[in-house]
Amino acid sequence: FWTPWTCTYPVPFLLKIFIPVISLFIFCTISCTDSREQPTTKLYELKGQALGTTWTIKLLTKDTKDEKDLQKNIGQRLEELEKIFSHWRPDSELYQFNYAVTSAPFSIHPKILELVKHSQWMNIQTGGAFDPTIAPVVNLWGFGPVGITRSTIPTTDQIEKSLTLTGMQKLEILHKGMVRKKVPALQLDFSASAKGEIIDQICKLLSRWGFKNYLVEIGGEIRAEGKGRKGKGWIIGLE
């Protein structure tokens, strides 16, 4: 006579059969759930031109983004920053500073003032080697915004004359965002620091949008955040 409580197999034998089966079922269930709940990380690669050079931004995120909107918004921010730091554009804050031939106090853009203060500190730390007032010499050699293409090397007299217009001590920081050129023809060339500042501003923008894994490159200058695509950091190639 058979009852629900009788069994022809010993309990240990049944456990050997059912435990692996149940474990496999649970594993499959969890795996399927994880695959649904964890979207694939997507790479967005944006490119453009600014500051007389090219830029590339790589974004890694699990969220779906409108690539056209990202391109547009980043491009607009770069345009805003270029209108501050470019020494080539006549409508930029830096260009207007450079061609204000005066020794009277005048106000400058807060971002320009930040770079001036940083440049003064760097100038002291490097014993004068870092000097953005080198702009007249850069122009003399044909690498500035003056549009001169040189076919000959500048003379010693020309170089020495240009050097008389340089020196961070010839730019005085006053109060309330005011500065004064002790030499009216003094000019600034922030090629060594403006791109880095702009990259920092773009990174702040990306972080504010919620991105945590990205690489920003402008004209060869790079900043990266996060662990890259494989979780081991961003791989940078040098040419």
Residue locations for each model-derived region?
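Tryptophan (W) side chains
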Residues: 2-5
